[in-house]
UniProtKB/Swiss-Prot annotation:
Thioesterase; part of the gene clusters that mediate the biosynthesis of AM-toxins, host-selective toxins (HSTs) causing Alternaria blotch on apple, a worldwide distributed disease. AM-toxins are cyclic depsipeptides containing the 3 residues 2-hydroxy-isovaleric acid (2-HIV), dehydroalanine, L-alanine which are common for all 3 AM-toxins I to III. The fourth precursor is L-alpha-amino-methoxyphenyl-valeric acid (L-Amv) for AM-toxin I, L-alpha-amino-phenyl-valeric acid (L-Apv) for AM-toxin II, and L-alpha-amino-hydroxyphenyl-valeric acid (L-Ahv) for AM-toxin III. Pathway: Mycotoxin biosynthesis. It comes from Alternaria alternata (Alternaria rot fungus). Belongs to the AMT4 thioesterase family. The gene is AMT4. This is Thioesterase AMT4. One of its GO terms (molecular function) is hydrolase activity. Its EC number is 3.1.-.-. Keywords: Hydrolase, Virulence. Disruption phenotype: Produces smaller amounts of AM-toxin than the wild type but still causes lesions on apple leaves. The lineage of its organism: Eukaryota, Fungi, Dikarya, Ascomycota, Pezizomycotina.
């Protein structure tokens, strides 16, 4: 896969589906997008999901270069890379936190591009809240609070913090995408952390998405942990299992339709 800005290769192959001895077609790949820190680090803790898993990291995280047109420009860039590097066909999109917003944006772009060769059979948001514009100014001014692991180098912590501030600023211009007339929205699942970061924090079941003018979330499943502990050893097994099973459910109607043609 060819290199991008800062020497980063996108997409990154996080998990590879073993095709040895299998006569049936491979499952639809899962394409995951980076979190607010621009990294794919957490996704490498996922247990086997039974399909190819690709990841898109922010190629400008190290340099700090701005995306002038915000999330839309970022998504256009990733979609171009996706068409260059991933085989056309059915795909499942997803992401943790900020990555879920990118997945939604890409899903809308793919639906609008009839000649692109991809069909999104489902979207999985991993504890992705609907952006609250009122919270942007305080996050940018005070800096994000991120509980880093002890083994994360100081230089990487600084890159993540800087990326999170930049991405938070981009959210102030972002609106949840709507699907073009005549196109049906793919099923969208929210895997929601059972706990809040703050015990006093009140979070709605759909994490604010119910306030959108149009329905975004079709179903919600709870997973153990809070926003930052989802990928820790005590919780990663359940998260992986829910993600694996949800991908199977989303893909099943499309595989049945293809086999009957």
């Amino acid at each position: 896969m060819s290199g991008l800005d800062d020497g980063l290769e996108n997409p990154v192959l996080i998990q590879e589906y073993s095709r040895q001895g299998r006569a049936t077609a491979a499952p639809a790949p899962l394409v995951l997008f980076h979190d607010g820190g621009g990294t794919l680090f957490s996704y490498f803790f996922l247990e086997s999901l039974g399909r190819d898993v690709f990841g898109f990291a922010d190629p400008r995280a190290t340099s700090g270069q701005q995306w002038k047109d915000g999330i839309t420009e970022m998504a256009i860039h990733y979609y171009k890379r996706m068409k260059m590097e991933i085989r056309p066909g059915s795909v499942i999109l997803g992401g943790w936190s900020f990555g879920g917003l990118l997945a939604l944006q890409l899903a809308q772009m793919i639906a609008s591009d009839s000649a692109g060769g991809f069909e999104v059979v489902g979207v999985v948001l991993i504890d992705t809240s609907c952006p609250e514009k009122a919270s942007y100014s305080s996050t940018v001014a005070n800096g994000p609070i991120v509980p880093f692991r002890d083994d994360v180098p100081d230089c990487m912590q600084e890159i993540v913090r800087t990326s999170m501030v930049r991405n938070t600023e981009m959210l102030s211009q972002w609106e949840a995408p709507t699907w073009p007339q005549g196109y049906s929205k793919p099923p969208i699942l929210l895997l929601r952390a059972a706990e809040g970061i703050d015990a006093k924090e009140e979070r709605s079941l759909k994490l604010g998405w119910e306030l959108c003018q149009h329905d975004v979330i079709d179903s919600v499943e709870m997973v153990p942990g809070n926003h930052y502990s989802l990928f820790e050893s005590d919780n990663i097994g359940t998260l992986s299992s829910r993600l694996r099973e949800s991908c199977k459910r989303m893909e099943t109607p499309y595989r049945k339709a293809a086999s009957s043609d």
